[in-house]
Amino acid sequence: MEEVMPIIQVEMLKGRTLEQKRALAEKVTQAVVETANCPKEAVRIIIREMDFENFAQGGVLKCDENK
């Protein structure tokens, strides 16, 4: 059976530190390794950060939340 590498995409608002992103990558990788039974080298993670003006919840842009 051909091994298919898992690609995980994480979308979140800007503001996390580099250390937080490292920790996220490590923990997500470990979870995928344990559940998908694949080597950690096969796990790919894409982190996409959004500006606060590009995310809305309940019809309100995140940048307008506290106005």
Protein language model regions, located:
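A domain-level signal for the structural core that forms small-molecule/cofactor-binding pockets
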Residues: 2-67
